[in-house]
Every structure is written in structure tokens, then in C-alpha cells.
A protein has these predicted regions:
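Conserved acidic carboxylate
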Residues: 34
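Two-component/phosphorelay signaling modules centered on CheY-like receiver
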Residues: 37-59
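Acidic, metal-coordinating helix/loop segments flanking the phosphotransfer/catalytic sites
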Residues: 44, 58-78
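Receiver (REC) domain active-site loop signature in two-component systems and cognate sites
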Residues: 85
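As written
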Residues: 125-131
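C-terminal output helix
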Residues: 138-149
Length: 164
């Protein structure tokens, strides 16, 4: 490949620019989309015990979560979503978020946290550019440890977040 003198100058200028790490909004709210009230209560207790400073916002329906995400200026830290929900399920919600350029550019990690782990769901989920698929453990202690590991990972991760 032949590089012109102008291209070499442009490359040299780019290399001199400061490298910026763009981080996701780690202080933003944690969105949990879960229609099971018992699971909501368990997750509330776990997040309280883990003492995260992030606001926890629950939605029982995917439609309500989408309304919130498209109408707020707040950039959530992470989204935990169930798959099987009434009206707009987790897969459909993920598709709508991915199709919305403003939401897509916010680079909000979208994770499935569900009891449903059928092969079809896992394949469909990853085809929609999700950032993780976790089978919800049945034991409280295991749920808590899974949440701790997930949040810890995303707290240390750098994301190409949308810069305004």
C-alpha cells in the first residue's frame, strides 16, 4: 500500500492527539426489567446488601422501560432484562433499543438475566448484540454473587459511549 505525503502528515497529526478513554455512566441508574414481583423483591434486597450507590429502577413491562429510555436524558449504567414478559418481551425490547440510534449510541450494556435459557433464546439474544446472557440462579446467595460479578465487570469496563 502506498501512502501519500499528505496521508502521512494526517496520520502523524492523529497520533499527536491525546487519547481519551470514554467511559459509560457508571453512576447512572441500573435498569431492571422484570415482571415477577418476587424476583423484583429479591433483586431489591440483593442490590441493597451489595450497597451500590446507583439508583435501581424497575419496570414490569418492556414497553414502560422503552418509554423511559427514549424520554429521559439520564444515561443508565446497565440494563438487566428478563426475556418472557407481557406485551413487549425482552428480545423485542432489545431490538427496539438497537434500532433507536440515540439509545444505541449511549452504549448501555444490555444483559439478559432470565430463568429461560433455551438454545434459541441464547442464539437470538447474541444476534441482537447483547452484552451478556445469564441464567438466573435459584439460590439467593448465587444470585447475589452473579450480580456482584456482573456489576464489578461493568464497573471496570471502558465503553465507546456517545459523547455530546
Amino acid at each position: 500500500m502506498i501512502i501519500s505525503k499528505l496521508q502521512k502528515q494526517q496520520i502523524a497529526e492523529i497520533k499527536r492527539l491525546p487519547l481519551k478513554k470514554i467511559k459509560m455512566n457508571k453512576g447512572g441508574p441500573i435498569i431492571i426489567i422484570e415482571d415477577d414481583l418476587d424476583d423484583q423483591e429479591i433483586l431489591t434486597d440483593i442490590f441493597h446488601e451489595l450497597d451500590y450507590k446507583n439508583e435501581i429502577i424497575f419496570f414490569a413491562e418492556g414497553e414502560k422501560a422503552l418509554e423511559y429510555l427514549t424520554s429521559t436524558q439520564v444515561e443508565p449504567f446497565i440494563i438487566f432484562s428478563d426475556i418472557n414478559m407481557p406485551k413487549l418481551n425482552g428480545m423485542e425490547l432489545r431490538e427496539k433499543i438497537h434500532q433507536n440510534e440515540d439509545l444505541r449510541l449511549k452504549s448501555i450494556p444490555y444483559l439478559f438475566f432470565s430463568t429461560s435459557a433455551e438454545q434459541k433464546h441464547v442464539v437470538d439474544a447474541y444476534s441482537k448484540s447483547i452484552q451478556g446472557f445469564f441464567v438466573k440462579p435459584t439460590a439467593y446467595k448465587e444470585i447475589k454473587e452473579t450480580i456482584r460479578i456482573i456489576v464489578s465487570y461493568w464497573e471496570t469496563c471502558v465503553s465507546p459511549n456517545y459523547v455530546k
